[in-house]
Amino acid sequence: MNRIFIFILFFFSFAFYPGYAQEKHLDVGDTIPSFSLKDQDGNSFNSTGYKNKNILVIYFYPKDESAVCTKEACSFRDNYTEFTKAGAIVAGINQASVETHKKFQQHHNLPFLLLSDPGNRVLKKFGVKNKFFLTGRETFVVDKTGKIVFRFDSFTKGKEHQEEALKVIKKMSQ
């Protein structure tokens, strides 16, 4: 009986733990850390290369091809021209491989960057917290100076990430 109790206690202590080894949660007004990741084509994406040039929309999501993540990605796809008209670069990030991202991109005709973050190194730099055993889902809008101007955190509302980010970007471009 004691073993069962200890197992249950151990299981739930990790199930509800918000994350591990994550840095400070970045918020509005913070400068994003510099990072470099490979995109779905194997090309390097360096965050500093966009400073003073583009607005960045960086969205972290748990898994390619899962229901909510696919809905989120397709929502960004369906409104991609609105983002590009405002001078924004959209980048989805998770720990999937370059190859997995390429398949996801091709399957859903995604026109934006999908960045591979092995070990969730960049996710941790942003302080995105895990939800249960899954990677967190958060979207950051970053202005041309590298400062976060908007952060949206909702694990179950994939489509709303795009909607909220687009509202902010439209206000920025007025």
PLM regions: where:
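N-terminal "domain-start" segment that seeds a small globular fold
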Residues: 20-48
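Structural microenvironment flanking redox-active thiols in thiol-disulfide oxidoreductases
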Residues: 70-108, 119-124
